[in-house]
Amino acid sequence: MKQEIHPEYHQATARCACGNEFTVGSTKESIKVEICSQCHPFFTGKQKLVDTAGRIERFRRKYAKFEQQKSGK
């Protein structure tokens, strides 16, 4: 086996987009994460609603002109 080929493993600071910081073991010195247990809906008990109705309406308006052209031919 080759000697000393393993990366250096040390304590790293993980920073969430919400501002929370916590320490984990990693080969990197710092880690940026988008979501953590302090802001994730499963852990906080708060549900975030996604505006799917608005997206569907925007899609229908965008492609309505194609349907009109198709039925006009």
UniProtKB/Swiss-Prot annotation:
Name of the gene this protein is made from: rpmE
Q: What is the name of the protein in this document?
A: Large ribosomal subunit protein bL31
PROSITE patterns xref list: RIBOSOMAL_L31
Tell me which PANTHER family the record gives: 50S RIBOSOMAL PROTEIN L31, CHLOROPLASTIC, LARGE RIBOSOMAL SUBUNIT PROTEIN BL31C
Name the family the entry cites.
Answer: Belongs to the bacterial ribosomal protein bL31 family. Type A subfamily.
Entry annotated with the keyword Ribonucleoprotein:
yes
GO-annotated biological processes: translation
**Which free-text remark accompanies the cofactor?**
Binds 1 zinc ion per subunit.
**Assembly with partners or alone:** Part of the 50S ribosomal subunit.
Q: What does this protein do?
A: Binds the 23S rRNA.
Q: Which cofactor does it need?
A: Zn(2+)
Q: Which GO terms describe its cellular component?
A: ribonucleoprotein complex; ribosome
Arranged from A to Z, the UniProt key words for this protein are: Metal-binding, Ribonucleoprotein, Ribosomal protein, RNA-binding, rRNA-binding, Zinc
- Asked if the keyword ATP-binding belongs to this entry, the reply reads no
**SUPFAM superfamilies named in the record:** L28p-like (SSF143800)
Q: Provide any one GO MF term from the record.
A: structural constituent of ribosome
Instruction: Tell me which residues bind Zn(2+).
Output: 16, 18, 36, 39
Stored InterPro entries: Ribosomal_bL28/bL31-like_sf, Ribosomal_bL31, Ribosomal_bL31_A, Ribosomal_bL31_sf
